[in-house]
């Protein structure tokens, strides 16, 4: 199970429980996001980082903030942590990524899904890589390590982070754990909400 599958399952579960939900992903489906999503073979380093950050800033203004103002719970499949990792794979420093993402919202919860690199490689071989990052040989070791660094970086900046290991858990178990974490955050914010 990957990040997108987990996000869909979480949104479906919370929506079925009656919570007003807004599901989104990054890169977005806006033109900037599509350029970033389909341009990983063309754009690298700072160019790709700028595309991803521009898409994130745009999406925040036109999609995420309006959904939050409407009282919806927003679940975003990928956010700043993904940029810290992917742009890190391209050799950019986390400081550079943070500069490009200055002013983005700090979410109420960031969930990092990671797994044993061999398991990640096996899953990617099974479904095929969608981007040059996923198609690269043995990239999972480096990606997993960068996610560990991203967690430390996010926490140092005051972002609430939970890390879940996908190595052995089923998709249903992972989704249930994320739903529990979101419900706990919502309960802390507004007990009447959940």
Predicted regions and their residues:
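Conserved acidic residues
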Residues: 72, 108, 161
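Substrate-engagement module of ASCE P-loop NTPases
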Residues: 96-106, 143
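Conserved nucleotide-binding/hydrolysis micro-motifs of P-loop NTPases
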Residues: 28-30, 80-81, 115-121, 169
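Walker A/P-loop
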Residues: 4
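NTP-dependent small-molecule kinase module
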Residues: 9-13, 118-194
């Amino acid at each position: 199970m990957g990040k997108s599958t987990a996000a869909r399952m979480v949104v479906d579960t919370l929506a079925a429980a009656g919570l007003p939900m807004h599901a989104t992903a990054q890169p977005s489906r806006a033109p900037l996001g599509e350029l970033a999503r389909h341009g990983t073979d063309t754009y690298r380093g700072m160019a790709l980082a700028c595309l991803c950050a521009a898409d994130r800033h745009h999406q925040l203004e036109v999609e995420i903030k309006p959904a939050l103002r409407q009282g919806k719970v927003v679940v975003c499949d990928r956010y700043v942590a993904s940029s810290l990792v992917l742009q890190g794979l391209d050799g950019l420093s986390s400081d550079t990524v943070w500069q490009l993402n200055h002013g983005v919202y700090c979410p109420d919860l960031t969930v990092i899904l990671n797994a044993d690199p061999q398991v990640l490689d096996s899953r990617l071989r099974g479904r095929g890589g969608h981007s040059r990052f996923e198609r690269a040989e043995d990239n999972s070791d480096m990606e997993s390590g960068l996610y560990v660094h991203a967690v430390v970086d996010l926490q140092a900046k005051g972002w609430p982070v939970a890390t879940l290991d996908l190595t052995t858990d089923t998709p249903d178990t992972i989704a249930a754990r994320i739903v529990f974490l979101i419900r706990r955050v919502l309960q802390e914010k507004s007990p009447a909400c959940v």
